[in-house]
Every structure is written in C-alpha cells, then in structure tokens.
Amino acid sequence: MTAYLRPGVFVEETLNPLPPALGSNATSIAGFIGAIDRGPVDVTAINSWSQFTSLYGGYGTSNLVHLAVLLFFSNGGGTCYVRRTVGSGASTSTRSFNDRAEAPASTLRFTSANPGVWGNNINVSIQNSLSGTAVDVIVYYGGTSSTNIVEKFTDLTMGGNDERYLVSVINAQSKYIAAVDLGSGASGVSRLPVTATNQYLTSGSDGSAVTASTIGNDVTAFDVVHNSLILNAPGVTDSTAVAALVNYAENRGDVFVIIDPVSGNVAAQLTTASGYPVSSYAAVYYPKIVIKDPTSTVAGVTLTANPGGALAGIYASTDAARGVFKAPAGITTRLGGAISVASLTNSELDSMNSAAAAVNAIRYITGSGIVAMGARTLNPAYIDKYVPVRRTLIYLRKAMTDLTQFAIFEPNDEKLWRRINASLDGFLRDFWRQGGLRGTAPAQAFFVKCDADNNPQ
C-alpha cells in the first residue's frame, strides 16, 4: 500500500482475487447410450443432427439411438454425448494390398473406421495419380457406381515423411476407413500399393447381440465426460439395466436418468417401475409417442418412438429458458415431433401419480399439444421427489465444487475462508436472484459457512 504523507482521503483500486463467476455448468448436456449399426465406439460429443449422421450414418437396423438424438435436437437440445455400445467380439472389416516390387509383399491395409458388419459394404479403388509417382484412393459405400463414392484422396505416397503420406492423410480425414503401413521392404514407387478396382473390405462383425444388460454395464464409458449429464438409454426398461444406470448416476452425483416407458398398459408400467431403485436421480415417463417415420419417404407413415430423447431436449431447453430449478413439465413443454399419444383416464393418471415409484404422464392437452405433465423422481419420500429439486442440487453441488477448486493446496487460514465465503455467497446470490432459491432476502434463502468451526485443522 502506498504511504501518503499529506492529510486527506485516498482511494485505491484493488482487483478482488476471486475466481471467475460461473456461467452454466452445462446441466443441459445429454448422454445417449445404445446399439448403433456404425460409428465411433468412444464417447463422442455431438452438436447437431447433421454431425450425428455424418459419424453414425443414416437409419439402419437399430434406430433407437438415432430417434432419441433426432428428438433431442428437435426439442431444443444443444449438445449431447453418444456412446455406441457394441457386442463382445465386434471387429472391423479389412483389406490388404501388395506393393509393386518384383517379389510383391504386403504394403498397406485398410480397415473400416470402426467395428461392425457395416464395414463390409465399403470397397476401395486404387488408381495411379496424374504424376505417376503417387496414387489416388477412392472410397465407395453400398455399391460400386459413381453415386456410391463417399470419399476421394489424391496424390498419396508411401513415404512416411512426405506431406501427402497416405496413412497420415487418410487417418486424419476419412470417416470410413483407416490405413496401416505394413512396412514393405520396397522403396520409392515400388512401395506404392498396386492398382485395384472396387476391392471390398471383409470380415467385419457386430459381435454378440447387444442387450439391455450390455448397455447397463457399458454406462461407465461416460466417466470421460466431466459435465453434468441428462442420461437416456433409449428403450431400456429392464430392471437390472436400469439399476445399473441409476447407480451410476447416484455414484457420480451429477447425472440424472430419463427412463423410457414399457410397451404395455399403465398397469404393466407401474409394475415395471416398482422394480426400479428408489432414487431421486431418475424419472420414468409414460406412454410412448407417435411421430412421423423419418425412415420412410411415403407421406403419412408414422412409427411409435420412445420419448426419452424429446424429454432430454425439453430438460435442456427449459434450463436455458428458465433455469434448472424450473420443472421440465407443464403446458409449455410441448414435445416437438410428437403427432399423437395414447389417452390416459383420470384413474390411470391418479395411479401413476400416487404410486411409490411415480410415473410421469405424457398427455395431449387442448391448446397446448402433447406435453409432459409430471415431474416426479423415483424417490417418493422426501423433497427431492421432484425432478427440479434433485437437478438443482446436482447443479449447485457441481457449481460450488468448480468454484472452490482454487482452494486446493492453499493455506487453510482465515484469508482462504474469506475468499471461499465471498465466492459462494456471490454465486448463491445470483442464483437466488434468478429464482432458484426461495426467500425474499438472501438470508432467508441460504447461508455460507467456512470458518474455524468447520475447518478445525
């Protein structure tokens, strides 16, 4: 501090050494897990429907995740993570090529970008480039005509230090194949792969069938995601698999699970839900919804879809518009893409709402359309029986943990306690002003205590 030798009042500006205030801690990010015909097996961030289809392809034999992601983006979702679960023994498709030496040896192997029988639909042509000292690689999918060309790479060499080294270029740019240099002993042009036309990759396998149990056991793949998640395993209703998802959410403490409905009637749904864990980290919705069939080019064709993806989108859009403390339910939560939904009687609605394992209704409301009309978790006993209460607690815990990361390895003294108190007080005041905490004044809404009482050492 400057020492002043003259009388007067002096003001000095000091930047408060607080960590930056948090914006959203990404409570509105979804996670989807299930069987998909093709695509990355690592958990992958997706920001649009077009990005999803570019990586995982169009509709195929297993469309549950496709439909969930489509409905997520159709209902205001912004970012999701996708985990493609594959069966045991799944393998990539392959094709090897010889070099051009007098005694030919294997010089190059192509594999499908990821496992599954889908890779057996890939074929590759290798042509001499115009320079005569390099090759062009043309990738086809689903046929051998020019309309089946999906990628083309030109002027590729087999020199590991070359700018157009075939392996580096293809592995950096292709969404269909990966390349492996097999280390042929030849050099120069002789090391290039021989020319070939429409050589199919073979031996790709989906492995064993992906079951609900497989998906439940695979959920720990989301450990690489450090954001809070709205988790949905499209179509998974098996009690053991659901228990695995819910246990994962509880153990992490920052995941909330949306459980899709069974295909049966209300009684079947209530019976199934009664076998799920008692937990505030999950909610069940019923019934399924009818949407336009995106796989059909015929007008008017519909299909029955799981609502979990749409609801995850509604969770996300409600978070953005109102805050995580607002229930993702009510007449404003219209399920985009839903054309119709089965009617529920008053008696059925009463039983769904009063059950120990509550089931949230999806209903048609005149003037509003098809909306979510329930916000209960699978925990009937306490205040966190409501979805927004549990999700608010998830948000606050994650936000306050992030805000206080700076304190690790700092001296545990009064200076640190003041910083923590100031950081959390400011954050909670902002959350209170937004409507996230009850009370007409901050003192009625929250208190922060970090002092010698709870830091005795």
Ranges and model annotations:
Residues 186-210:
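Long, low-complexity, polar/charged, intrinsically disordered or flexibly structured peripheral segments
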Residues 212-215:
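Phosphate-interacting basic helix/loop segments used at nucleotide- and nucleic-acid interfaces
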Residues 81, 148-149, 179, 188, ...:
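Detector for intrinsically disordered, low-structure N-terminal pre-sequences
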Residues 1-102, 108-114, 130-132, 140-144, ...:
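Structured, hydrophobic secondary-structure cores that serve as assembly/anchoring elements
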Residues 42, 54, 175, 180-183, ...:
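Short, surface-exposed polybasic-aromatic patches that bind anionic ligands, especially phosphate groups
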Residues 9, 134, 176-180, 189, ...:
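A broad structural signal for short, well-ordered beta-strand segments within beta-sheet-rich domains
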Residues 105-172:
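Extended, Lys/Arg-rich, non-catalytic nucleic-acid recognition/anchoring regions
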Residues 93, 145-148, 155, 196-198, ...:
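N-terminal compositionally biased, intrinsically disordered segments and leader/signal-like regions
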